[in-house]
């Protein structure tokens, strides 16, 4: 049901890795859970890191069921080749540390295009614990339902060790916090209509255009408006950071 009959796949753990039938990246994969289970990141972030480690030429992507997931009722990830340079789409600098431990840190981005939280750690267990801690706090914003989030995770992009200057391997993750599924322009008719339903690609700066008539409507101002409309407000982000400080 969730994989085309003619699609071939490779097994990786309890997932099937397939070519995405509607690619928007040069190397674009869909990673499908073998069993029919709902789309949720809860208790799945460790799987995301497993995929990132075993597919280390790729960035692993997650869309929440109300944040652009192509099959919102069946668990899946996507992957894009690291050549896409979408791991830090806007040159974001996460400089405001929210919480740190011995081997991991997460920080939030203020006044950016999106409302985002970054996590990094050289330690796999450290980033898992940090994500799970954050997830529990984020859920409260969405009244205990599946949070409106998009997530990108990767392993193996080299970073500079602040203390020794050596290049190290590091786990990284960016969580995009959302306020809604789609902007108003998605539902609008006529000239105001713009068929954009942001998922992880759009949150990372890639906007596939479905309709030719929408090409002339895409401007930097419009994209900025869409980001602001579908992203969690700075006030809500502050409430979250206050909880985790």
Task: Cite the ranges covered by each PLM segment.
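Non-catalytic N-terminal regions of enzymes
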Residues: 15, 27, 37-39
């Amino acid at each position: 049901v969730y994989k085309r009959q003619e699609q071939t796949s490779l097994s990786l753990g309890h997932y099937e890795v397939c070519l995405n039938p509607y690619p928007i990246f040069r190397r674009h994969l869909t990673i499908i859970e073998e069993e029919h289970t709902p789309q949720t990141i809860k208790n799945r972030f460790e799987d995301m890191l497993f995929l990132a480690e075993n597919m280390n030429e790729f960035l692993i992507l997650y869309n929440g069921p109300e944040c652009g997931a192509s099959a919102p009722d069946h668990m899946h990830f996507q992957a894009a080749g690291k050549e896409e340079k979408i791991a830090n789409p806007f040159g974001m600098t996460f400089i405001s540390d929210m919480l740190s431990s011995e081997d991991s840190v997460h920080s939030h981005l203020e006044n950016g295009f999106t409302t985002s939280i970054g996590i990094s750690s050289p330690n796999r267990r450290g980033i898992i614990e940090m994500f799970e801690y954050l997830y529990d706090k984020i859920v409260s914003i969405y009244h205990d339902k599946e949070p409106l989030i998009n997530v990108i995770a990767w392993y193996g992009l080299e970073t500079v060790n602040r203390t020794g200057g050596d290049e190290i391997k590091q786990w990284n993750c960016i969580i995009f916090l959302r306020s809604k599924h789609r902007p108003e322009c998605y539902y609008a008719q006529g000239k105001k209509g713009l068929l954009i339903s942001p998922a992880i690609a759009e949150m990372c700066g890639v906007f596939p255009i479905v309709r030719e008539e929408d090409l002339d409507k895409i401007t930097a101002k419009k994209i900025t408006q869409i980001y602001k409309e579908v992203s969690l407000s700075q006030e809500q982000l502050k409430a979250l950071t206050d909880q985790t400080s």
